């Protein structure tokens, strides 16, 4: 059964955005730049899930374009699955509109793909799986 892995929030500045979470006693446990996505990420544990702050490294990146169009705020909700390949095939078979039909490798070596908001009630949905050697 999929579980919420993280909630992605697009921000102009991780340094500025993290201050509100730190004021609440929360702390960034991992920061990383994902070069192929042109984004810096910061993960903040929140119970069994995490908050992922997303800061673009270039204005023409997906997150940069999101900020230019919509401003800071909710970018995506990520669901963790045990078998990302099976999830991808199931969603393809159901006709879901996928951002990409390829599984990508993101922050922390996690595997992921995105489902377009037109298939999910208006929310960009990330499907992700922990790093393993045989995906």
What are these regions (language model features)?
Residues 3-12, 33, 42-47, 51-52, 64-90, ...:
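Vicinal oxygen chelate
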Residues 4-5, 24, 28-38, 57-75, ...:
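A cross-kingdom feature marking solvent-exposed beta-strand/loop segments within repeated
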Residues 48-51, 58-60, 84:
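Short, charged/polar surface micro-motifs in flexible loops or helix N-caps
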């Amino acid at each position: 059964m999929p579980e919420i892995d993280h909630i992605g929030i697009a921000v102009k500045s991780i340094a500025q955005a993290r201050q509100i979470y730190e004021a609440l006693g929360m702390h960034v446990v991992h920061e990383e730049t994902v070069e192929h996505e042109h984004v810096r990420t910061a993960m903040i544990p929140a119970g069994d899930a995490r908050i992922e702050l997303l800061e673009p490294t270039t204005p023409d990146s997906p997150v940069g374009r999101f900020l230019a169009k919509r401003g800071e705020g909710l970018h995506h909700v990520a669901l963790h699955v045990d078998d990302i390949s099976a999830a991808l095939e199931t969603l393809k078979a159901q006709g879901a509109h996928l951002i990409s039909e390829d599984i990508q490798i993101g922050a922390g070596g996690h595997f992921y793909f995105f489902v377009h908001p037109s298939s999910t009630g208006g929310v960009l949905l990330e499907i992700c799986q922990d790093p393993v050697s045989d995906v």
